Amino acid sequence: MALTQTRKQEIINQYQAHGTDTGSADLQVALLTERINQLTTHLQANPKDHASRRGLLQLIGRRRGLLSYIQKKDFQRYQDLIGRLGIRR
């Protein structure tokens, strides 16, 4: 279920703010979104996996908190990010 190292590096390269950025809020949201998408497909194939469903809800909550932070700090950056990630909120 975890992200492969190559996929994680692709996401980091795509969303990092500068060359050494590995933990900005935008990047964290992008990584969480990828994990959420993977878990969603897993749960569609395994609907009785309640432990994974709980983990999914925790990830969604963490992403929601980061998105709220970005929205408060810079609304335009927030709009761009949800547009790039395809998140409806």
UniProtKB/Swiss-Prot annotation:
SUPFAM superfamilies the record matches: S15/NS1 RNA-binding domain
Any one GO molecular-function label of the UniProt entry: structural constituent of ribosome
One GO CC term on file: cytosolic small ribosomal subunit
Keyword annotations of the record: Ribonucleoprotein, Ribosomal protein, RNA-binding, rRNA-binding
Gene Ontology BP term (one): translation
Pfam families: Ribosomal_S15
Domain of life: Bacteria
Matching HAMAP family: Ribosomal_uS15_B (MF_01343_B)
Oligomer and partners: Part of the 30S ribosomal subunit. Forms a bridge to the 50S subunit in the 70S ribosome, contacting the 23S rRNA.
PANTHER family linked: RIBOSOMAL PROTEIN S15, BACTERIAL AND ORGANELLAR, SMALL RIBOSOMAL SUBUNIT PROTEIN US15M
Similarity field: Belongs to the universal ribosomal protein uS15 family.
Classification via NCBIfam families: S15_bact
Biological role: One of the primary rRNA binding proteins, it binds directly to 16S rRNA where it helps nucleate assembly of the platform of the 30S subunit by binding and bridging several RNA helices of the 16S rRNA. Forms an intersubunit bridge (bridge B4) with the 23S rRNA of the 50S subunit in the ribosome.
Protein name stated in the entry: Small ribosomal subunit protein uS15
Higher taxonomy: Bacteria, Bacillati, Cyanobacteriota, Cyanophyceae, Oscillatoriophycideae
